[in-house]
């Protein structure tokens, strides 16, 4: 790779310097997809090196674009599945309202206990079903690829 880049650089420098010196009389320039090929009467070595770099560049692109081998792909999945936050309303009993109006700390602790117990019971079941769905989907896609 370095060798072809150096040759290409030398060829372009030579192309720029030849018209300045006025050494060549008939110079034709044709541009291809990857490099500039120059043919002149005085610089035949530049032409030869330039054509080799052009062919090398085209073979590299054609070999990379053709799909002869099946490469093994590794997929990285995110472990955490993001879900929208559910809003839970805590409904109080009339007996709780009478006590809690005077004491703030007791209501906070009750809210924490209720929200943590309800979220753990319902949250674990929903995450299990979600994970199994994802597992099935991954298994299907893995079967398709192989």
UniProtKB/Swiss-Prot annotation:
Keywords: Repeat, Secreted, Signal
Record carries keyword Secreted: yes
Places the protein is found: Secreted
GO cellular component entries: extracellular region
Compositionally skewed regions (Basic and acidic residues) per UniProt: 93-106
Compositionally biased spans, kind Basic residues: 67-92, 133-146
Biased amino acid composition, Low complexity: 24-66, 116-132
Sequence repeats by residue range: 31-38, 39-46, 47-53, 54-61
InterPro entries the UniProt entry points to: Ng_1-3-like
Major site of localization recorded for this protein: secreted
Region (Disordered): 23-146
Record's signal peptide: 1-23
Region annotated 4 X 8 AA approximate tandem repeats of T-S-A-S-A-T-T-T, chain positions: 31-61
One protein family per Pfam: New_glue
Tissues of expression: Salivary gland specific.
Name this polypeptide is given: Protein new-glue 3
Provenance organism: Drosophila melanogaster (Fruit fly)
């Amino acid at each position: 790779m370095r060798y072809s880049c150096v040759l290409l650089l030398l060829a372009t420098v030579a192309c720029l310097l030849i018209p300045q010196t006025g050494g060549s009389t008939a110079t034709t320039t044709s541009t291809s997809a990857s490099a500039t090929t120059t043919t002149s009467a005085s610089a035949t070595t530049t032409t030869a090196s330039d054509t080799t770099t052009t062919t090398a560049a085209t073979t590299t692109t054609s070999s990379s674009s053709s799909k002869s081998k099946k490469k093994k792909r590794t997929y990285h999945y995110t472990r955490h599945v993001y879900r929208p936050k559910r809003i839970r309303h805590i409904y109080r009993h009339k007996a709780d309202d009478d006590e809690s109006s005077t004491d703030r700390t007791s209501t906070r602790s009750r809210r924490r206990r209720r929200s943590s117990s309800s979220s753990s019971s319902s949250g674990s079941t929903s995450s299990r079903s979600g994970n199994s769905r994802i597992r099935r989907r991954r298994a299907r896609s893995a079967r398709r690829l192989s």
